[in-house]
Swiss-Prot record:
Homohexamer. This is Phosphopantetheine adenylyltransferase. The lineage of its organism: Bacteria, Pseudomonadati, Pseudomonadota, Gammaproteobacteria, Lysobacterales. Coiled coil: none annotated. It is an enzyme of class 2 (transferase). Disulfide bonds: none annotated. Pathway: Cofactor biosynthesis; coenzyme A biosynthesis; CoA from (R)-pantothenate: step 4/5. It catalyses: (R)-4'-phosphopantetheine + ATP + H(+) = 3'-dephospho-CoA + diphosphate. Keywords: ATP-binding, Coenzyme A biosynthesis, Cytoplasm, Magnesium, Nucleotide-binding, Nucleotidyltransferase, Transferase. Reversibly transfers an adenylyl group from ATP to 4'-phosphopantetheine, yielding dephospho-CoA (dPCoA) and pyrophosphate.
Amino acid sequence: MSVANSRTAVYPGTFDPITNGHIDLVNRAAPLFERVVVGVAYSPSKGPALSLERRVALAQEALAAHTNVEVRGFDTLLAHFVREMGAGVLLRGLRAVSDFEYEFQMASMNRHLIPEVETLFLTPAEQYSFISSSLVREIARLGGDVSGFVPASVVEALRQVRQSRAQA
């Protein structure tokens, strides 16, 4: 088990898919920390559209410009992953007031599980505050244009998912 380092932050999520809002949060966090670990959760119960490997690869591509950001998949309890990474900070994004209740509950639970780790909430730029992965997936599933919400590589990955489902 690693010792918590306040200069290392973990930003967890399913990132199914990674959006411009997620990228904006990492862009804001990267200058604040020596190391930011984007933890891509396996989360089979959420029925992800993209495999864990594909989500990790898309996030790595989207965040490649940051030398202090690494992307890792995980399939353990978040508290265990945070400890494994030696992080002292857990980053969470708040898009709107509606996110707060859930995030507050999660932060409280994490405080009990990993009391040595602080949760830090960041808000995305206003132009990204309405973007969610679930909305992007639904728009893409129905053939809509998601290019304003995600990187081009994600647009292509979602197009491939839609195409493979149409052929099934």
